[in-house]
Structures are given as C-alpha cells and as structure tokens.
C-alpha cells in the first residue's frame, strides 16, 4: 500500500502500539505522554467491530473507535500520529463516516469522550461529530488537567 492513499482497516493492538509510540498529534497532548502504557493501552482499545485504523504507505497514522463502558454506553476515542496532519480531510471524513454507523450497528445509545479544556481543536472536532459539551470535569485528566465531557445520544 505505498500509494499515499488513506486505507481504512480494522483496528489491531499492533496499530495502536505503533501510533502511541510515535509523537502525539498535537503539542497539548504531549502532557499525557508520561501516562501512556503503549502495550497495555493499545490492547485495551481492541473491541470487535468498534474500532478502525487509517493507514498510509503501510503505516498507521490514526485509529478511532468506541470502547463499551456498561450497557449501551461507550467511550469514544481517537489516537493519531503527527502524520495525520498530512491527510486532515481524509482522516476527519473517515471518522465521521463510521462514527454514527458503528454506534447504530452496535445498539449504542450514548457515546461520550473527555477532551482537555486546553485542546480547542479536539473540542471543535467533537462538536463537528455531533457531540455536545455536557460539563467541565475539574482535575480529571491524567496530569490533573480540567477536561470537558462531550456526548452524543443515538
């Protein structure tokens, strides 16, 4: 796949390990780097039919999906390398395309995601996906950062 084209494939722990071992995709997220367990966190995101990876030239550049929390409630997540900025529209469209489909196909009624208060790009992306800001969670982040809870109901 050495064609500079974004290919979407099912997520694997190996994809996550590669992405998490690379530089984070935004300087604001570097604060979380010290709290990431590359192998364990990558494996923890594996859940059948709920996650996918974007690959360019045989390298994963982002992965996104949902992790069931309880009942029909899932946590939405995205991890990415800095390479994703070379394909921002393709990445955004791929995530938006599969976001609602994955939720509906798996009878998920709520998808939620915590986003750092100082990560405005992440907040705008969540809103573009149809998530609504529910409230501020003080000192909720790994590093004690304030984060907003965003959610979308289906």
Segments (PLM) and residue ranges:
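A conserved beta-turn-beta hairpin within the catalytic core of GNAT-like acetyltransferases
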Residues: 68-78, 146
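Conserved beta-strand-loop-alpha-helix junction that forms the acyl-donor binding cleft
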Residues: 108-127, 132, 140-141
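C-terminal "cap" of GNAT-fold acetyltransferases
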Residues: 139-154
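Short amphipathic alpha-helix that is part of the acyltransferase structural core
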Residues: 1-36
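A short, internal acetyl-CoA/4′-phosphopantetheine-binding micro-motif in the GNAT/acyltransferase core
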Residues: 78-94
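Conserved acyl-CoA
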Residues: 94-110
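Conserved beta-hairpin
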Residues: 48-64
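Active-site rim helix/loop that mediates acceptor-substrate recognition in acyltransferases
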Residues: 31-50
């Amino acid at each position: 796949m050495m064609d500079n084209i974004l290919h979407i494939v099912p997520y694997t722990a190996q994809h996550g390990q590669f992405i998490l071992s690379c530089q984070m995709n935004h300087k604001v997220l570097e604060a979380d780097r010290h709290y990431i367990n590359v192998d364990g966190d990558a494996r923890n995101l594996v859940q059948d039919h709920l996650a996918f990876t974007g690959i360019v030239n045989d390298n994963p550049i982002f992965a996104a999906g949902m992790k069931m929390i309880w009942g029909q409630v899932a946590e939405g997540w995205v991890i990415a390398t800095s390479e994703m900025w070379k394909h921002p529209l393709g990445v955004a469209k791929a995530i938006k395309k599969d976001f609602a489909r994955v939720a509906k196909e798996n009878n998920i009624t709520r998808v939620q995601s915590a986003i750092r208060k100082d990560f405005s790009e992440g907040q705008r992306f969540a809103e573009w996906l149809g998530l609504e800001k529910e409230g501020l969670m003080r000192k909720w982040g790994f590093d004690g950062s304030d984060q907003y809870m965003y959610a979308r109901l289906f």
